[in-house]
Amino acid sequence: MGKYHSFVNVVALSLSLSGRVFGAIGPVTDLTISNADVTPDGITRAAVLAGGVFPGPLITGNKGDEFQINVIDNLTNETMLKSTTIHWHGIFQAGTNWADGAAFVNQCPIATGNSFLYDFTVPDQAGTFWYHSHLSTQYCDGLRGPLVVYDPDDPNASLYDVDDDTTVITLADWYHTAAKLGPAFPAGPDSVLINGLGRFSGDGGGATNLTVITVTQGKRYRFRLVSISCDPNFTFSIDGHNMTIIEVDGVNHEALDVDSIQIFAGQRYSFILNANQSIDNYWIRAIPNTGTTDTTGGVNSAILRYDTAEDIEPTTNATTSVIPLTETDLVPLDNPAAPGDPQVGGVDLAMSLDFSFNGSNFFINNETFVPPTVPVLLQILSGAQDAASLLPNGSVYTLPSNSTIEISFPIITTDGVLNAPGAPHPFHLHGHTFSVVRSAGSSTFNYANPVRRDTVSTGNSGDNVTIRFTTDNPGPWFLHCHIDFHLEAGFAIVWGEDTADTASANPVPTAWSDLCPTYDALDSSDL
């Protein structure tokens, strides 16, 4: 770590070569984190920004690349925290657990006025990912953006003609009050932003600019849909067009035709859109499950515009979805079978997580997650190897190496009270993808070819979503609700995977070791 160490020449070159929707950078780049005012929906507020923009710049690379992303912390607004970390959502970080970015699990935060180099390779993954602050609720204030790893040998390449910066679509909830200053559990966002623009339906809003995505009639587009949400899930659709899903959370899946996609916080889908309709403008809709849930006046909307169509807003009407996405219809393209034996409990270790809520905090197995002062990885490197020795007490579970693991998330109602209010809760596992052998809304188990992903909705009362994965990646890995306000309220645990081999598998750089002493020396006003 150092004072403003910079790859600025590389960044300048990257920016000069892009200049498209997001202004793509990477895989070697600076990423400066700073505060600035933004007005994405007609209302101005201070925000936490990556690269000075919302959403943050698209970061790209190819399968097999080494990513070297130098995060420079220039934050000055203490109401949104001056420190930061960056999590690379969906990247396995095999051998680089220290670069996973979860504050107080994998690292101490980067102090304001300092920088830290995230240096990791992506040898066997390609697809659609994203990055965000993983410190408290900071990403709700703006620090979030898309990340794409391209595959030069993409098995689906014959299905589309266009896949570039212009075909990335981000969906974000937006709040006019800083997360630390607002309610612990907001009732809903003030607006929904599609590629960083949206409309606010309240006072001071109005007909602000919306994102326009342009297509050419006759071409096939691979759109990469990324939910960078802090809370709501969205029902996404494009008037007059079906979508063919080919990728789920960085995993190729068999082609599946749908006309709407319910996408939860942290999830991603690639879909093919065939621009085979009349030259015109069509509404793109992303309706949240909380807040304003219609599209009157262009809220929750963007525009799909065919080349040569008039520069006007669409007049298309929403129709009832007839082939909505159903998670159980998604089938992985390669090696589709779930780990373990094809029967209930047919794994080396099975565990059911007991959720509860006391009005202010969420609990898993009667413990609410309170971030430790010493990161879990540092605890392991310092000699703590078993759950009894690892902090926070009761929130760290050790997992054996090279084992099959089954985790269940029962959502139950007792005496009229839901064990986890605010459902459905999307749960994200760091360091892995998993097979969803029982999905929300389903009572059956599928061990032969279940969807494989890294973020799953745990559904509503009566659901018992069940996942399986293999412990092949030593290190501490966060498992948490991706509604960021719920994570802040303790809805998380840590898997201490193969603690005995964690140190040898994850050699840490000196700069990582310097993070905690620097952070621990900060005045409370600089945290």
Swiss-Prot record:
Glycans are attached at residues 74, 77, 156, 209, 233, 242, 276, 317, 358, 366, 393, 402. The keyword Chloroplast does not apply. Keywords: Copper, Disulfide bond, Glycoprotein, Lignin degradation, Metal-binding, Oxidoreductase, Repeat, Secreted, Signal. Its EC number is 1.10.3.2. Cu cation 3 binds at residues 134, 430, 480. Cu cation 4 binds at residues 425, 481, 486. GO terms for biological process: lignin catabolic process. This is Laccase-5. It comes from Trametes villosa (White-rot fungus). The gene is LCC5.
